[in-house]
Each structure stands twice: as C-alpha cells, then as structure tokens.
C-alpha cells in the first residue's frame, strides 16, 4: 500500500491577503485594520470547490508587499492581529481545511530589528553577521552606511546569512511560534531555489518534530 502525505493529495486554494483584502500598498498605519476577518466568509466557497488546504501569505508585518519582513512574529497590521489569524485557522480546521503559510527566510526588509541595529551600531552590532556580504567600506544605494548582498539586486531585501546558527535558530523559533500560536499545518518556502540546502534540511528536521 502506498502511503501519501496529506499535501500530496490536497486541493490548495492560494490567497495573497494584502491584495485580496485591499490593503494599503505601503504600511504606514498607526492602528490595526482587521481585514482578516473578511476572509472567514471565503471558507464555505473554498469548501464548495472541494478545497482542502489554503496557502496564504505573506502574512507578517512588512513595509510594502509582504516580502520585506519587519517582524516574523506579528501579523501585518494592515491585515489584523495575531488573534485574528489564529481564529481564521481555527475556523479552517473546523471545516476540514489545512493552512500553509509563506516562509520568507531568504531575506528581510530593511526595517527588521537586526538590520536596524547594524545601521545604528555598525561594526559593534551583535547582528553584523546576520546578513550576507556586509561591508562597512561602502554604502548601499538606499543610503545605508554599509553594503550587503540583496535579493536579485533589490536592496530593500537584504539577504539573511543562513549559515549563521543564530539566524537559523531565530527562524526556527519563529516557526515554533507560528505552530504554537496559530496551529499552522505547513510552510511554503519563498525563494526556495536560492536557499541553502543545509538550512532546508535542518528546517525539515526541526519542523517535523513540531507538529
């Protein structure tokens, strides 16, 4: 008998929440907009299509399109709160739908805490090895007082150093946070074609033990 994992047989429905819910293109909100609550009405529609899983993302606090992450453990204020998303996942599970989120692990936004610390403290920053190609001998085209490797030359997306054990642990802890607080069922890897294979192998080992 051939055993299949649930995702091999699932019918996925893809949601890009910032677009579907009409969020502002730039995150300048001072208050939270509870747009995720509007997604709850989509659950019966997805079930009617025989959907058994939702791939949703990016979800977490970012400056613009969702892939320039500010905070891996906070739902984007343009979408709602952590509690809003946890409730959405709960409703999905009650309707037999699993939830997979976007894992944006190749890079962050420039407003991410580690990047901001390097901007402020330069060589004295404990996070100076969290990004690839950090060079204090030149500045970025965006005015940062150091250079760094950026995803496909987009300097608003500085590349994380996934060979750094501290970076890996931070990301693994963030995933544990998602499992504990949202009860997610899986992760889609953004930019998987450029992720370090060793990181992905360890990621698989760590997450298999989480749920």
Kindly give the residue locations of the regions a language model identified.
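Active-site and adjacent substrate-binding regions of carbohydrate-active enzymes
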Residues: 1-211
């Amino acid at each position: 008998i051939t055993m299949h994992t649930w995702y091999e047989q699932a019918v996925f429905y893809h949601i890009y929440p910032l677009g579907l819910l009409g969020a502002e293109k730039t995150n300048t909100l001072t208050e939270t907009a509870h747009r995720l609550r509007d997604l709850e009405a989509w659950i019966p529609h997805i079930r009617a299509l025989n959907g058994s899983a939702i791939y949703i993302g990016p979800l977490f606090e970012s400056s613009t399109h969702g892939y320039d992450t500010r905070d891996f453990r906070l739902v984007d204020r343009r979408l709602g709160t952590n509690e809003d998303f946890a409730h959405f996942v709960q409703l999905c599970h009650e309707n037999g739908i699993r939830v997979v989120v976007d894992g944006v692990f190749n890079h962050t936004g420039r407003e991410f805490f580690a990047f901001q610390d390097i901007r402020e403290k330069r060589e004295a920053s404990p996070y100076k090895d969290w990004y690839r190609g950090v060079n204090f001998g030149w500045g970025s085209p965006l005015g940062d007082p150091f250079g760094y490797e950026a995803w496909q030359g987009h300097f608003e997306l500085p590349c994380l150093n996934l060979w750094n054990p501290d970076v890996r642990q931070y990301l693994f802890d963030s995933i544990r946070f998602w499992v504990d607080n949202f009860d997610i069922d899986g992760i889609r890897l953004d930019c998987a074609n450029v992720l370090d294979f060793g990181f992905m192998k360890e990621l698989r080992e760590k997450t298999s033990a989480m749920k």
